[in-house]
């Protein structure tokens, strides 16, 4: 995708862009996917801010790296999509809007490795940040449900933290979408 954008930028700068070809279609699809992904993240965050404003704090917070020395050059920013907090409980949600919520290798469906590594890293760094306080930190990968036959809906206990992977069905009436989001908050925060 980066090469595609670079190539299009080059053609535009050089004045060589003349047609609405497959390249333009791919670019528009890419931009639409990026917008939809951001919209999905923002929808979930704003839903929790509005519907649980007096019960849960909802933000898109940065999580500081918990380093053993002061060397932090070249480390990426850990920017959560959604971080929900209530008292001593924290739920970090990484919202994923993909065409395929699972990867398939050798006819076996598995979670996207990079997504799992990302949420695990967020959770463990937040856990360590709060080590001096009584707390519980959990993570969730929340995929927009696709039309695939197999989709994730699992809860894992990893190194002392709960990591949940589930889907949000956006093809339902809004009241049922809201019920799905409410259930996440109610179960996690015992509301």
Regions found by a protein language model. Give the residues of each.
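Residue(s) in the substrate-gating loop at a strand-loop-helix junction
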Residues: 1-31
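Catalytic core segments in nucleotide and nucleic-acid processing enzymes
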Residues: 33-191
